[in-house]
Curated annotation (Swiss-Prot):
InterPro entries: Slu7_dom, Splicing_factor_SLU7
GO cellular component: catalytic step 2 spliceosome; cytoplasm; cytosol; nuclear speck; nucleus; small nuclear ribonucleoprotein complex; spliceosomal complex
Motif Bipartite nuclear localization signal in this chain: 129-169
Keyword Phosphoprotein: yes
Protein name: Pre-mRNA-splicing factor SLU7
Role description: Required for pre-mRNA splicing as component of the spliceosome. Participates in the second catalytic step of pre-mRNA splicing, when the free hydroxyl group of exon I attacks the 3'-splice site to generate spliced mRNA and the excised lariat intron. Required for holding exon 1 properly in the spliceosome and for correct AG identification when more than one possible AG exists in 3'-splicing site region. May be involved in the activation of proximal AG. Probably also involved in alternative splicing regulation.
Start-end of CCHC-type zinc fingers: 118-135
Gene: Slu7
Residues bearing PTM Phosphoserine: S215, S227, S235
GO molecular function (one): zinc ion binding
Length: 585
């Protein structure tokens, strides 16, 4: 234990003298140290009363010593306390009270006629000095003249509120201001009563009330409930209940005549969003924002136009959402091209720029269209009436039969072909397709089967006919030569095919063997050259400093071929071979 420790039990309270505060602490004996530890254990177990500070508050015995011990510069007497751990009053912020507020209005009646000590020497105001005065410097200041002393400035107090004071909506409210509204309503009520009394006096003087009282309906109690007199008497109630229908609660109905509230017990047919589709894989419902963006009936196969609710995503395509998205896209594109525009920073500038851009774009399209029409023509096709008018009702009378044939009126026009008609090229006298033979189309004038051929006339017909005769004669001779049976013909064909296959196999074997050997030799030569180049490259790299060598990751990693393995074996050095020294010679 250090010599600075003091027994809290034996320590006497400090009297406040300097001699007591400057005494050196006495060294604790072993017995005192043991008693102190036992007392601490008893306090922790609750068998002994806890320590008490100067304010009479109990000190928790479980607080560590490095927290509960008082520094020497705060209290040299070492009295048990936790005051040094609490917020110090001199460091606490002083907040304004709830009754304090800024001054409202300026007192204009008080006028100062005499210079006051400590005021501005130039104008005479008490709220500033001469160097801070904003008034024009006078030739002789107010300190010496004592005239034209300026009024004091309206200086507002510096208020500093806490968290709740800053958020108090009624802070600075004067309840006396509400009395003005009460007085105004009282005056209106008094004016209504005077007007009503004046009206009754006029009716009594004119005799209307006497006539109504002597009427037979009034005597037998058959007066109409909506008579003029009842309306006049209930005018005040009507004024009070004028806006009753506008402020009634949902599900309630306010009867202004009987002054009762009637519950509207109707059946609510609306369905909650999350109950429209109970499938957990359907549209997601966010309970925090009460939003369901997707359509809950998307998987049910229902048309969104026929459903009462199809999700909240329609809000994204209503109002100015689409135009704002187009403006944002234009801002991004303009910023990429060097224009300093931003949707949030300069919305007005961006809107004007976007409008001018659209006007210039339309003008450019019109100019481009006009230039194309001037160069190539075709304005008459653009001036044609729209398709709606072309297919509209006409005055032509047409009568049809049950089967769709025209009985009376304009007959149906013949459908035109999509191919060119009556177009004769290359001196042909007939069109292409006028002649057909053996599944082929041609020209009738020369019997030619080539579409873009030149016409040969009758000579072409004769040449075609002679070729056909020669072909037919040769086939006839072959047929007359050997009248063989089908079995013999089939056997001959098989023999010829076998001979051809044998010849092909022999030719393939001889050619393939020689070709394979040549290819292998070429591949091996290439692999040997590549291996020599690799060895030279390795030799160069080994001569370079280890830190300056390139990375191995730049080389391709693949499985080597047979030729590359053979070249590696042929070029590999074998130190165990006795003839290895003669390989380099």
């Amino acid at each position: 234990m250090s010599a600075a420790a003091v027994d809290p039990v034996s320590a006497t309270p400090m009297t406040g003298s300097k001699e007591m505060s400057l005494e050196e602490p006495k060294k604790m004996t072993r017995e005192d140290w043991r008693k102190k530890k036992e007392l601490e254990e008893q306090r922790k177990l609750g068998n002994a009363p806890a320590e008490v500070d100067e304010e009479g508050k109990d000190i928790n015995p479980h607080i560590p010593q490095y927290i509960s011990s008082v520094p020497w510069y705060i209290d040299p007497s070492k009295r048990p306390t936790l005051k040094h751990q609490r917020p110090q009053p001199e460091k606490q912020k002083q907040f304004s009270s709830s009754g304090e507020w800024y001054k409202r209005g300026v007192k204009e009646n008080s006028i100062t006629t005499k210079y006051r000590k400590g005021a501005c020497e130039n104008c005479g105001a008490m709220t500033h000095k001469r160097k801070d005065c904003f008034e024009r410097p006078r030739r002789v200041g107010a300190k010496f003249t004592g005239t034209n002393i300026a009024p004091d400035e309206h200086v507002q107090p510096q208020l500093m509120f806490d968290y709740d004071g800053k958020r108090d909506r009624w802070n600075g409210y004067n309840p006396e201001e509400h009395m003005k509204i009460v007085e105004e309503y009282a005056k209106v009520d008094l004016a209504k009563r005077t007007l009503k009394a004046q009206k009754l006096q006029e009716e009594l003087a004119s005799g209307k009330l006497v006539e109504q009282a002597n009427s037979p309906k009034h005597q037998w109690g058959e007066e109409e409930p909506n008579s003029q007199m009842e309306k006049d008497h209930n005018s005040e109630d009507e004024d009070e209940d004028k806006y009753a229908d506008d402020i009634d609660m949902p599900g309630q109905n306010f009867d202004s005549k009987r002054r009762i509230t009637v519950r509207n017990l109707r059946i609510r047919e609306d369905i909650a969003k999350y109950l429209r589709n109970l499938d957990p894989n359907s549209a997601y419902y966010d309970p925090k924002t009460r939003a369901m963006r997707e359509n809950p009936y998307a998987n049910a196969g229902k048309n969104p136009d026929e459903v009462s609710y199809a999700g909240d995503n329609f809000v994204r395509y209503t109002g100015d959402t689409i135009s704002m998205a187009q403006t944002q896209l234009f801002a991004w594109e303009a910023y990429d091209k060097g224009s300093e525009v931003h949707l949030q920073a300069d919305p007005t500038k961006l809107e004007l720029l976007y409008k001018s851009f659209k006007v210039k774009k339309e003008d450019f399209k019109e100019q481009q269209k006009e230039s194309i029409l001037e160069k190539y023509g075709g304005q008459e096709h653009l001036d044609a009436p729209p398709a709606e008018l072309l297919l509209a009702q006409t005055e032509d009378y047409v009568e049809y039969s049950r089967h769709g044939t025209v009985i009376k009126g304009q007959e149906r026009a013949v459908a035109c072909s999509k191919y060119e008609e009556d177009v004769k090229i290359n001196n042909h006298t007939h069109i292409w397709g006028s002649y057909w033979k053996e599944g082929r189309w041609g020209y009738k004038c020369c019997h030619s089967f080539f579409k873009y051929s030149y016409c040969t006339g009758e000579a072409g017909k004769e040449s075609v006919n002679s070729e056909e005769c020669i072909i037919t004669g040769a086939t006839a001779e072959e047929s007359v030569k050997k009248p063989q049976a089908l079995l013999e013909l089939h056997q001959e064909k098989l023999k010829e095919e076998k001979k051809k296959k044998k010849k092909k196999k022999k030719h393939r074997k001889s050619s393939s063997d020689s070709d394979d050997e040549e290819r292998k030799q070429e591949k091996l030569k290439k692999a040997l050259n590549a291996e020599e180049a690799r060895l030279l490259h390795v030799k160069e790299i080994m001569q370079i400093d280890e830190r300056k060598r390139p990375y191995n990751s730049i080389y391709e990693t693949r499985e080597p071929t047979e030729e590359e393995m053979e070249a590696y074996r042929m070029k590999r050095q074998r130190p165990d071979d006795p003839m290895a020294s003669f390989l380099g010679q």
